[in-house]
Amino acid sequence: MEPKAPCPAAVPSEERKFRVLVGVTGSVAALKLPLLVSKLLDVPGLEVTVVTTERAKHFYSPQDVPVTLYSDADEWEMWKRRSDPVLHIDLRRWADLMLVAPLDANTLGKVASGICDNLLTCVIRAWDLNKPLLFCPAMNTAMWEHPLTAQQVAQLKAFGYVEIPCVSKKLVCGDQGLGAMAEVETIVAKVQAVLSQHGSIQQS
């Protein structure tokens, strides 16, 4: 089945919703994707679409995510000839804000290095730096404390991306320490703060 087009037809500016593109990666915190999407949809004026990595799919059921969800296969199924849409470009044009939650250690390293080998990292590599991009690191404490992690987070901040810091708690593996994704309420509040700064959305 051909995926639904990511870019809706033009609508009057007063009906234009603020478009949030959620990226989800292969951290166990991806378990919270259905809750995160649900809470975002509770915010008046938000429209949500999800881009997932293949590994992230291990942690949630697509049936529990009540919005359009794209993965790597969609990029290739939609493009057959030169005139066909390029999904990662269409998505970066469609979105007003990108939220990567969770951002696992693997994808953090890719983004910091400019690697774009799946749909999500291609969207990020093509991202319009005039638009906000929020990221929520999530990984085991031992991975979080590796010196590379601080360097890579700093690189993302240098790009202009905004970190929603991880928190300290008992992790799924049983360890206690930093590395857990920020609470859903914290993430949604940050999105709302960005939304409040964009009272009028320019029609794209």
From Swiss-Prot:
The keyword Flavoprotein applies. It catalyses: N-[(R)-4-phosphopantothenoyl]-L-cysteine + H(+) = (R)-4'-phosphopantetheine + CO2. FMN binds at T53, D104, A105, N106, T107. One of its GO terms (biological process) is coenzyme A biosynthetic process. The keyword Transmembrane helix does not apply. Its EC number is 4.1.1.36. Keywords: Coenzyme A biosynthesis, Decarboxylase, Flavoprotein, FMN, Lyase. Pathway: Cofactor biosynthesis; coenzyme A biosynthesis; CoA from (R)-pantothenate: step 3/5. GO terms for molecular function: FMN binding; identical protein binding; phosphopantothenoylcysteine decarboxylase activity. Binds 1 FMN per subunit. Substrate binds at N140. Belongs to the HFCD (homooligomeric flavin containing Cys decarboxylase) superfamily. Catalyzes the decarboxylation of the cysteine moiety of 4-phosphopantothenoylcysteine to form 4'-phosphopantotheine and this reaction forms part of the biosynthesis of coenzyme A. This is Phosphopantothenoylcysteine decarboxylase. It comes from Mus musculus (Mouse). The gene is Ppcdc.
